[in-house]
UniProtKB/Swiss-Prot annotation:
Belongs to the phosphoglycerate kinase family. It comes from the Bacteria. It comes from Clostridium botulinum (strain 657 / Type Ba4). Keywords: ATP-binding, Cytoplasm, Glycolysis, Kinase, Nucleotide-binding, Transferase. It catalyses: (2R)-3-phosphoglycerate + ATP = (2R)-3-phospho-glyceroyl phosphate + ADP. This is Phosphoglycerate kinase.
Length: 398
C-alpha cells in the first residue's frame, strides 16, 4: 500500500469549501462528552484550514444509529464543545437526512474561515454501504475532501471513500498524516531491534497480525488471554484459562515460523492465576508455565513481566496492541503496568496501537511518555496486518 499521500498542506484551500471527515465518535453521558481526546485530536487540522481561509464542513459518525435518526446520537454536543475549543461558533446543520435544507443553507452562507458541522453520517443507511446517492450528496457541498478519521480508515463508507469519486482533490489531515508516519515507518522501515507486543483475549483477532509481524520484527511478545492458547500449543496445562481450541494448531505453526525466521518469540514463563474471574479473587503466582486444575490465568507473572520489560528496554522500535492481563482488576493489572512502564522509560520509538492498550496507557498516566498513541483500534490492527486501508487508499498520492 502506498502511504505517501497528499496532506492538507499540499493543496490550496483558500476560499474553497472543504469537507473534513473527522472522528467525533465520542462517549456521551446525559448529553455531556466524557472523553474529549478525539475532539482535541481534530483541532490542528481544523485550525490550519481556518487560518488558510477555507470554508470548513465537518462530518463524522457517532455510535450505531443503524440508518435512522436517534436523538441521543446527535452531534449537537460536539458542535457546542468545538465552538468553545475554537473560540468560534460552529454552525450545527441539524438535518435528519444529513444533507438537507439546513446543511445546504449553512454552507451557502459560509464566509472564509467559517465552520459547519453536519449531523451524524450514520443517520443515513447508505453511509455504511457506501452507496452512491449519499456520497454524491455529501460531495455536492464541497470542492475538496480531507480525511482525518483514522479510526474509520479501514471502512469503505460514503464519508470515507465514496465522496472521493466525486471530489478530485482528496488529502489527509494532520491526524492521519501522523498515523501514517509512525505506523508506516514501524511496518516498512523500523529502527531495529523492532519489538512487537500483542495481548488481548483472542488469538483469532490477531491471526493475520501475528503472521505479518513475524516477517518484520526481531522479537514478538505474546501476553493476555491469547497467551494461554500458545501455552497449550507448547504442551503445558492451562487449567480453566481462556483457550481457543481451534487455534492451538495455528499457534504451533507460528512458534515454528518464529524459529525459521530467527524471531525471538517470547511467551509467558509464569502466570498470575485465580479460581474465579472476579476483581476480588485472590491472585496466585504459578512457579512455571503450568496452571493447575480449577485455576485460570488472568495476568502474566512477575518473571515474565521482567523478561518482557528487558526486551522492551533493548529495543529501538516498539509497537504494542492489547493488554497483558485483566488490567481492569487491580490484582491482575501488574503485567500491563510493567510493560507500559518499560515503554515509558524507553528511548525507543514507542507506538500504542489504539483500543484497550491506549486506554490502559492513559489510565496509568503514561500517555505523554509514548511517541505515538494511535486513534484507531481496528484500523491500526489492519495496518499491522499489512492490509490496505480503503479510506487512505482513496486519497491522492503525493
Amino acid at each position: 500500500m502506498n502511504y505517501n499521500k497528499k496532506s492538507i498542506e499540499d493543496i490550496d484551500v483558500k476560499g474553497k469549501k472543504v469537507l473534513v471527515r473527522c472522528d467525533f465518535n465520542v462517549p456521551l453521558n446525559e448529553g455531556k462528552i466524557t472523553d474529549e481526546n478525539r475532539l482535541v485530536g481534530a483541532l490542528p487540522t481544523i485550525k490550519y484550514l481556518m487560518e488558510k481561509g477555507a470554508k470548513i464542513i465537518l462530518c463524522s459518525h457517532m455510535g450505531k444509529p443503524k440508518g435512522e435518526p436517534k436523538k441521543e446520537l446527535s452531534l449537537l454536543p460536539v458542535a457546542k464543545r468545538l465552538s468553545e475549543m475554537l473560540n468560534k461558533e460552529v454552525i450545527f446543520a441539524d438535518d435528519d437526512n444529513v444533507v438537507g435544507e439546513n446543511a445546504k443553507k449553512a454552507v451557502e452562507d459560509m464566509k472564509d474561515g467559517d465552520v459547519v458541522l453536519l449531523q451524524n453520517t450514520r443517520y443515513r443507511k447508505e453511509e455504511t454501504k457506501n452507496e452512491e446517492v449519499f456520497s454524491k450528496e455529501l460531495a455536492s457541498l464541497a470542492d475538496v475532501f480531507v480525511n482525518d478519521a483514522f479510526g474509520t480508515a479501514h471502512r469503505a463508507h460514503c464519508s470515507t471513500v465514496g465522496v472521493t469519486n466525486y471530489l478530485k482533490e482528496a488529502a489527509c489531515g494532520y491526524l492521519i498524516q501522523k498515523e501514517l508516519k509512525f505506523l508506516g515507518n514501524a511496518v516498512e522501515k523500523p529502527e531495529r531491534p523492532f519489538v512487537a507486543i500483542l495481548g488481548g483475549a483472542k488469538v483469532s483477532d490477531k491471526i493475520n497480525v501475528i503472521n505479518n509481524l513475524l516477517d518484520k520484527v526481531d522479537t514478538l511478545i505474546i501476553g493476555g488471554g491469547m497467551g494461554y492458547t500458545f501455552l497449550k500449543a507448547q504442551g503445558y496445562t492451562i487449567g480453566n484459562s481462556l483457550v481457543e481450541e481451534d487455534k492451538v494448531e495455528y499457534s504451533k505453526e507460528m512458534i515454528d515460523k518464529a524459529k525459521e525466521k530467527g524471531v525471538n518469540l517470547l511467551l509467558p514463563i509464569d502466570n498470575v492465576v485465580a479460581d474465579k474471574f472476579d476483581k476480588d479473587a485472590s491472585p496466585v503466582v504459578t512457579e512455571d508455565q503450568n496452571i493447575g486444575e480449577g485455576y485460570m490465568g488472568l495476568d502474566i507473572g512477575p518473571k515474565t513481566a521482567k523478561i518482557y520489560s528487558d526486551a522492551i528496554k533493548s529495543a529501538k522500535t516498539v509497537v504494542w496492541n492489547g493488554p497483558m492481563g485483566v488490567f481492569e482488576f487491580k490484582s491482575f493489572a501488574n503485567g500491563t503496568i510493567e510493560v507500559a512502564k518499560a515503554m515509558a522509560d524507553s528511548d525507543a520509538v514507542t507506538i500504542i496501537g489504539g483500543g484497550d492498550s491506549a486506554a490502559a496507557v492513559n489510565i496509568l498516566g503514561f500517555g505523554d511518555n509514548m511517541t505515538h498513541i494511535s486513534t484507531g483500534g481496528g484500523a491500526s490492527l489492519e495496518f499491522l496486518e499489512g492490509k490496505e486501508l480503503p479510506g487512505i487508499a482513496a486519497l491522492n498520492d503525493k
